[in-house]
Amino acid sequence: DRPGNIKNGIESINILEIDQTAASIFYRSYKSNFSDTTLATVGDQILLEIKSNEAIQEPSITIASNPAAVVDNGGNNWSASYSMQDGDSDGIIPFEIGVVTDSRGNPNSGVISSTTNSSVVIFDNTKPLLNIVRIISNNSDSTWAKIGDSISVTFKSNELLTQSSASISIESAELTPLSAQKYVAKYLMQSSDVEGDIPFAISFTDSVGLSGDPVSETTNSSNVIFDKTAPILDYVHIESNNSNNTLIAITGDDVFLTFRPINTDPIITDSIIVTIAGQVANLSQNGSDYVGTIAINGAIPGGFLSYTIDFVDRASNPGEQVIVTTDNSYVNHDIVPPSIDSVLIYSSNFDPNWAKSGDTVFVEFFANEQLGSMNINISGRDSSSYSFEGLN
């Protein structure tokens, strides 16, 4: 007391513990309930699991910037969950653990937004797209196809796909991955397939099960036309440039074989081979007509000239070899000079063996073939006229 008297006190049975150390969240792990726990889409649940080194008060946690449902699992273990919504942003799903306060009221240093095991969850609410789609055939002209040709539809997506399928010409196509996001669908054209532009369709699904809009058009305007019909020539005509008769040719004359394909089935000019009398003809084009030409020489046998036309269309379908004209035209190679077999002269006189002034004198003769032109002289004067009667 104040005068200085001392008395020993009694020791208290209560102990006051002073705690000024904040709790630590030493374990943080993140996952979704999707089959791939690193991915999520609308409706998937995101789960954040945390562990503290001591008892804490219920923490405030947001997932995808939205309040999460927090559950105390006991033993300083907590979990927070959130179901992803349509309006949430695509990409890595953020989370935040607010200021954590232990049971004695000590707050930690601030917001926590990362895991301790590098786990992340990516939110995908966007349909996948195909940003490259192309179609070609293995035909010599890749924009055409015939029976047995292979059609390839190559496509590339803007993200990984888990499922995809394709049809070509309304038939199931064989699908092969070329890389992580690139695929090719192939199909062999059949006789039962419909002619024209070859249709295709691609269905595909991304890693979280979102289906893209079916694709049936290319991104580069490519297309392939199926043609299973052999080309046809609807006009074939042969003639010569003989000055007397285009049905006849002699040495020095030219012979022309003119033909025209059906305009709906173009043929490849470089594929055309024309022969006349066994000789390869020179080929030229006049509008939609093709003309094969040879010059007649003495080595070509006499008689009706034979010819062939071979050709293929744009799809490489071969046409049937043409050996006849469409208008029954022909050219006869004449190698025998004309001859006069017999000659008869008479007059219009009562006695045909005599003639007086004013009488008409006739010369009648028989040739071995039809003559084109002739010069007849009677008594030193050119005949005023002549006529053709019969074949001789």
Predicted regions: what they are:
Residues 8-28, 102, 113-138, 217-234, ...:
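Flexible, low-complexity linkers/stalks enriched in Thr/Pro that connect modular domains
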Residues 1-2, 10, 61, 80-103, ...:
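Contiguous beta-strand segments of beta-sheet-rich domains
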Residues 45-50, 150-155, 254-260, 360-364:
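A short beta-strand segment in extracellular, disulfide-stabilized domains
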